[in-house]
Amino acid sequence: MKNEEYKKLSINEFTKAAGRYESNHAGIYEMCKKDYPDILAELEKEPFRELLDAGCGPAPMISLLAEKYPDRHYTGLDLTPAMIEQAKKKNIPNATFVVGDCENFPFENDSFDAIICSMSFHHYPNPQAFFDSVKRCLRPNGRLILRDVTSDNKILIWLMNTLEMPLANICGHG
């Protein structure tokens, strides 16, 4: 599957899931709460003012971080407009949400002190493009905090990239 085809599939499947992504059945918010302590521990090592959540979905991680650090600014980026609509409904006053591609950040150079990417990296068909965007948009001494699933098994990766989203929409995300 070509990169653009995969991105269209992602948008289609995550649009279907957007309204129920954080429901009790889906468990995404609970999964984010499990990642949150590790991400928070990394963020607490160095101060930050501007944070990007790449692949933010409906912004469960930004919601948690904004409660802890209400004096910081957060930007959420997601490819799926319906996910950004859900994030905006949370009315987080110190957050901005942008529809865009995590393989080509729509931001100025040196925009962020920290970039987090939690459980979305495996959906990026061109990982190097993501890292190039991170390098361009991180300020000097900025940090990338990346949490995701991984495997060396090419069949498992293919199954995850091809079947995960349609199955998750049938069975529930999380």
Question: PLM features: what roles do these ranges have?
Answer:
Residues 1-46, 60-64, 83-86, 145-168:
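Conserved class I S-adenosyl-L-methionine
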Residues 48, 112-113:
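Local beta-strand N-terminus motif with an aromatic residue
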Residues 52-54, 58-104:
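Class I SAM-dependent methyltransferase SAM/SAH-binding core
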Residues 116:
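A conserved beta-strand element that flanks and buttresses the S-adenosyl-L-methionine
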Residues 119-120:
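Short catalytic micro-motifs in class I SAM-dependent methyltransferases
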Residues 128-140:
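A short glycine-rich, Lys/Arg-flanked "PGG" loop and its adjoining helix->strand segment in the class I
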Residues 172-174:
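Short alpha-helix
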